[in-house]
């Protein structure tokens, strides 16, 4: 499966026109930023303090599942600081010279945004350490016995790193971030507000009930909510005179095979495979990947997080296990052996703690 082909994929859409629309509906200030109240309040405080001292903001690490607004928040930081932002990604920075070219072109207090920062090569990461800590760049000139190292002073800048896999960051890199923010899945109410705002910007007639129906199937992810809004708009324009109501949204999303929990065919296939082929688990991640013909990282990074967060799957030392919630979702009888397992509410409480 190609992840970008999923309607409820949290990764970026490859369609150029939709990317332009995405940029149009992104908030550009903390005042417009919806959800993540703790992150928003903290960043507002840190930014005001840095501006009051006429300093650059501390280096900031933003992590969390795809589609929650890490890139948007990085751009907001630059906007609120009144500086420019230069964006790149970890895989693009193949050589130290690639990073050096970006760093030497920064103005004082500018923001350098590195997406997928966990994918930086070790040799590039080594160059980043003194740049972050001392605002200096170590460059090797010459080769062989004539090679020598010189230090270039850099203007004070803010590195904003974004990652979906904070655990893959090396300790030396993680320790150099003064601000660390985790983005959580959004509530349905916040997503409904985001959908309504996007519809207003795009000029779409949308009822509050329609926005809520889209929001509750968006897997707690703004990027998915906006993508569903565009597909429901297509349905409404062809079959409902362009007006999006609750019933129109329901019909459109059912046609698109997105159920009331935000699951699509891939989610249901994963759960049913665990139930039917592995007796509910435990099952190892490699066996599960082979059974559904998926890459291991796709299951870990794309499919699992939301299913775990919603209490349909548990990770145990012996492997993945479905909860009774998964059996109930498909109308299946709960095995008697699951009577020994924690109920879903207790499991979710344990996750929250």
Swiss-Prot record:
Region listing for Head domain (RuvB-H), in residue ranges: 260-353
InterPro entries documented for this protein: AAA+_ATPase (IPR003593), AAA_lid_4 (IPR041445), DNA_helicase_Holl-junc_RuvB (IPR004605), P-loop_NTPase (IPR027417), RuvB-like_N (IPR008824), RuvB_C (IPR008823), WH-like_DNA-bd_sf (IPR036388), WH_DNA-bd_sf (IPR036390)
Binding site for ATP: 25-26, 67, 70-72, 133-135, 176, 186, 223
Catalytic activity as recorded in UniProt: ATP + H2O = ADP + phosphate + H(+)
Signal peptide as annotated in the record: none
Major site of localization recorded for this protein: cytoplasm
Superkingdom to which the source organism belongs: Bacteria
GO biological process: DNA recombination; DNA repair
Location(s), subcellular: Cytoplasm
CC annotations in GO: cytoplasm; Holliday junction resolvase complex
Single annotated GO MF: ATP binding
Family, similarity comment: Belongs to the RuvB family.
Cited function: The RuvA-RuvB-RuvC complex processes Holliday junction (HJ) DNA during genetic recombination and DNA repair, while the RuvA-RuvB complex plays an important role in the rescue of blocked DNA replication forks via replication fork reversal (RFR). RuvA specifically binds to HJ cruciform DNA, conferring on it an open structure. The RuvB hexamer acts as an ATP-dependent pump, pulling dsDNA into and through the RuvAB complex. RuvB forms 2 homohexamers on either side of HJ DNA bound by 1 or 2 RuvA tetramers; 4 subunits per hexamer contact DNA at a time.
Protein name: Holliday junction branch migration complex subunit RuvB
Encoding gene, per UniProt annotation: ruvB
